[in-house]
Amino acid sequence: MKKTDFRVMNNQDVELEFDGKAIAFIKSRKADHKIHAMAEEMIKMALDIGIELTDVIVDGGANEDIDRGSITDFCQTLDKTGAVVVFVDNIFSFTTEPDDLFKFIDTLMNRPVLLVDMEHNHTWA
């Protein structure tokens, strides 16, 4: 899949029933209660579409490189759970480097998973 092949949809276009599990990725250095609030919002959205959010990976570091421990943990969790939906607080939580981000999204889309950006209300399928 090439960069231009991604479909960006608003959440109104997303199929509301899924068969499988979901995981979440949050990059934040905010207080724990704020991180828990973000996770609760993701859990609620998962339940609303009839899917169980099993794991939330939190990256509290300042590093934005794609080759960091929290991304490795995320990928291992995705493999382990076989999740079909990935919630992320902001798509740029994975990395702010455009080429790395496109490659990473491309890797996710080859699984396939539905990627949900909570901050920008976008999904990628």
Question: Where would I find each of the regions flagged by the language model?
Answer:
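Short, structured surface patches at the beginning of a domain
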Residues: 1-125
